[in-house]
A protein has these predicted regions:
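Conserved SGNH/GDSL esterase-like catalytic core that processes O-acyl groups on lipids
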Residues: 162-268
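Active-site neighborhood of glycoside hydrolase catalytic domains
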Residues: 270-274
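N-terminal secretory targeting modules
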Residues: 1-146, 150-172
């Protein structure tokens, strides 16, 4: 049985292009509840634009039952996939016995690197007829977190002062942003990018001019600027009606501080950007 993207619960920002739904931000992804023996998906990515340290990574979490709240999310993924190919065949669930399960696919790696796009999803069984309606109609708190590497889960599985960055060590589901959403049982949307700031990216101490190649004012207004540019598309303005947060947390400033330092004019520029 083929499952359409519109029949899934979606986390985070996403967009459709040529019958593929792209989800590239940290903690974005989708969820379904099914009764059956198997679920599999074709996930697109762009390994040609990545090296071995920057390929997209997703985690698949399977829990028995039909609870779609974060309370039922396992601590560790059932499957973990590095998106090594342009088209990746991913098993999401497999069992010899028919079971009722909740399946969540979550983007572990962040938007600047390998993207993820759901091309197709097939199940051996049936979708729960009510899970999407129940999710859409509940009154869960909605939280949007705008942040940098901390929100992305940068280096969470790395060893401090030993390992160099790789997307294999990113775990958005263990970031403070995600853990906050879990504790609040809130619907979460993250717009985050490692090294980003409001007026400058992270720069070394000898840099005179700010690095404005990408700053949050250039990222947040758009649905998914990076992925759409990779696909040769004009970045679309994010439709805020798709997710109207009750709470917005802006966790930015660490990278700005590398350039702002204690220079008054720079501090005023940062404050004006808030």
């Amino acid at each position: 049985m083929k499952v359409a993207a519109d029949n899934l619960i979606w986390y985070g920002r996403n967009f459709d292009y040529q019958d593929v739904r792209y989800f590239s931000f940290s903690s974005s992804g989708f969820c379904l509840v099914m009764k059956g023996k198997k679920a599999s998906a074709k996930i697109l990515s762009d390994p040609q634009n990545c090296d071995k340290t920057t390929k997209g990574v997703i985690g698949v979490f399977v829990s028995e039952g039909n609870d779609t709240s974060w309370n039922s999310l396992p601590q560790e993924p059932t499957y973990r996939y590095s998106l090594e190919n342009t088209e990746n065949d991913c098993i999401l669930f497999e069992s010899e016995e028919e079971k009722v399960v909740t399946i969540r696919v979550i983007k572990f790696s962040e938007a600047p690197f390998g993207y993820a796009g759901l091309k197709s999803l097939e199940i051996e069984g049936n979708l729960n007829p009510d899970f999407l309606k129940d999710y859409q109609s509940n009154n869960q708190l909605k939280v949007e977190i705008i942040g940098d590497s901390i929100t992305c889960g940068y280096g969470i599985e790395g060893v401090f002062n030993k390992d160099s960055f790789t997307t294999q060590q990113e775990r958005a589901d263990k970031s403070y942003a995600f853990l906050t959403a879990k504790l609040l049982n809130a619907k979460l949307q993250c717009c985050s990018w490692s090294g980003i700031g409001l007026v400058s990216k992270y720069v070394d101490e000898n840099t005179i001019n700010p690095d404005t190649v990408i700053t949050m004012p250039l990222l947040w207004p758009y649905t998914d600027r990076q992925t759409q540019l990779k696909l040769g598309l004009e970045p679309s303005v994010w439709d805020e009606s798709r997710f109207s947060p009750d709470l917005v947390i802006v966790h930015l400033g660490t990278n700005d501080a590398s350039w702002v330092k204690k220079v008054v004019e720079r501090r005023l520029l940062y404050v004006s950007a808030l």
